[in-house]
């Protein structure tokens, strides 16, 4: 899973920002007012995993990319068994340092950003056997090249390049950083990331041939077809077709239907599978049963479409448990367009998804989940001018943690969320009951 992410000059984030996400649980929320940068975090991870176009902070236009050096740094807590080969060797070296790195090892300018991560590391150490896990900041910069962000220090250099000749240098050179490419590639290859933005087209997203749906199913349509239409069956089809052509040639005597090459081409497995996908799967659209009728998803309301996406993800993961083992799902505003009465059920479904996947991330304006979700973490994001503040709370004891942070900050934190969370939850439950009464009565 990703316990946090460093962002540098990405969208609303100027300079270096560290956003904590979790101390170990897979249910992770981001809440805060409009414009504070919740969606930017989910989008940046989509850039990291799926090579989407980067959206830079406006400062980069004035100062240039070389000067600002934008980057995205997810900090991964992953089982050692996930990696192998050379990537695992690199991970061993890097993780052994990161598990034990201290504030004194970090450059002075970066120490304030590092403290939140250090607090997380200390908390995580109390809950897991760290010998079973790698802790890895995996960095790509705006050029798509490996980097180490604030971790490019002497301690890390000595671990990764123990026999370096330039003893007086305190960081890895760009050439030395290239050695981490194998680790970056392996992590991105081993973990799948599905991002569901607020403005997603549900009709396209839910088609069977999309990559996202196939990831949720745990296998591709081609893999499914290989089981349903075997090589033996394809061989038999080719034999029958060739027999037909041979018989036709005998009837035509000096004429024959042939391919341009001397070797006559048969129907390939990929040809047949592509035809089946095009003629069978692509024409099928998601429908929802309402009464005795089936309604195509495009005929549903905006709220029903949003609910359908979460329902599909939940049910596919529920019945294909292996598909979620290395899957991170990120949802932007899952409550978008939903009636208040449906919010509670939507977030309950999100929680269940988090139990069957590597991690569930979401950005939301709805606080009603805080009092009722059993386990998980929420990051409250606030902003003053260009400065962001990130406060991570354990949902098992969020009331106590909020109270303590308010005391420690001398009342400077915007923690009216205790009232807002209860208010949102009560509204959702009451309205849901009213809807049931109206339907029954």
Where are these regions (language model features)?
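Extended helical coiled-coil dimerization/tether regions that scaffold
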Residues: 194, 202-328
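Conserved P-loop NTP-binding catalytic core
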Residues: 43-130
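Electropositive, glycine-dotted interaction segments
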Residues: 90-223
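H-loop/switch region of ABC-family ATPase nucleotide-binding domains
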Residues: 363-365
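RecA-like P-loop NTPase motor core
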Residues: 371-441
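Walker B catalytic acidic pair
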Residues: 332-334
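Flexible phosphate/Mg2+-sensing switch loops adjacent to catalytic phosphate-binding sites
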Residues: 50-76, 84-87, 168-180, 319-324, ...
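Pre-Walker A-like glycine/lysine-rich segment at the N-terminus of P-loop NTPase domains
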Residues: 1-50, 60-67
């Amino acid at each position: 899973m990703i316990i946090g992410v460093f962002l540098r000059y990405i969208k609303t984030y100027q300079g270096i920002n560290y956003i904590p996400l979790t101390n170990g649980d897979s249910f992770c929320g981001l809440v805060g007012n409009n414009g504070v940068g919740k969606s930017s975090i989910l989008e940046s991870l989509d850039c990291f995993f799926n090579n989407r176009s980067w959206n830079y902070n406006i400062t980069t236009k004035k100062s240039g990319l070389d000067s600002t050096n934008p980057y995205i740094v997810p900090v991964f807590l992953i089982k050692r068994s996930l990696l192998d080969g050379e990537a695992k060797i690199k991970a061993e070296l890097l993780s052994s340092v990161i598990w034990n790195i201290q504030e004194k090892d970090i450059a002075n300018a970066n120490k304030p950003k590092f403290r939140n991560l250090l607090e997380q590391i200390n908390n995580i150490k109390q809950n897991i056997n760290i010998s079973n896990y790698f802790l890895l900041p995996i960095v790509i910069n705006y050029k798509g090249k490996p980097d180490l962000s604030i971790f490019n220090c002497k301690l890390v250099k000595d671990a990764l390049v123990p026999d370096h000749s330039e003893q007086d240098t305190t960081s890895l050179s760009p050439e030395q950083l290239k050695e981490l490419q194998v680790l970056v590639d392996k992590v991105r290859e081993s973990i799948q990331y599905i991002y569901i933005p607020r403005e997603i087209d549900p009709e396209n997203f839910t088609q069977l041939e999309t990559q996202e749906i196939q990831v949720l199913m745990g296998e591709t349509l081609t893999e499914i077809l290989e089981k349903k239409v075997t090589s033996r069956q394809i061989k038999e089809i080719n034999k029958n077709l060739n027999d037909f052509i041979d018989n036709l040639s005998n009837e035509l005597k000096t004429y024959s239907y042939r391919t341009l090459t001397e070797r006559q081409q048969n129907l390939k497995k990929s040809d047949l599978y592509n035809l089946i996908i095009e003629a069978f799967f692509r024409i099928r659209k998601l429908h929802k049963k309402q009464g005795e009728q089936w309604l195509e998803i495009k005929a549903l309301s905006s709220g029903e479409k949003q609910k359908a996406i979460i329902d599909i993800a939940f049910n596919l993961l529920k019945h294909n448990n292996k598909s979620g083992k290395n899957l991170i799902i990120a949802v932007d505003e899952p409550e978008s367009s939903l009636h208040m009465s449906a919010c509670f059920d939507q977030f309950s479904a999100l929680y269940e998804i988090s139990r069957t996947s590597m991690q569930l991330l979401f950005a939301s304006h709805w606080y009603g989940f805080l009092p009722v979700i059993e386990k998980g973490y929420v990051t409250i994001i606030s902003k003053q001018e260009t400065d962001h503040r990130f406060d991570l709370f354990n949902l098992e004891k969020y009331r106590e943690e909020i109270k303590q942070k308010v005391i420690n900050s001398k009342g400077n934190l915007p923690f009216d969320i205790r009232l807002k969370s209860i208010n949102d939850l009560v509204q959702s439950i009451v309205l849901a009951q009213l809807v049931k009464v109206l339907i029954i009565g």
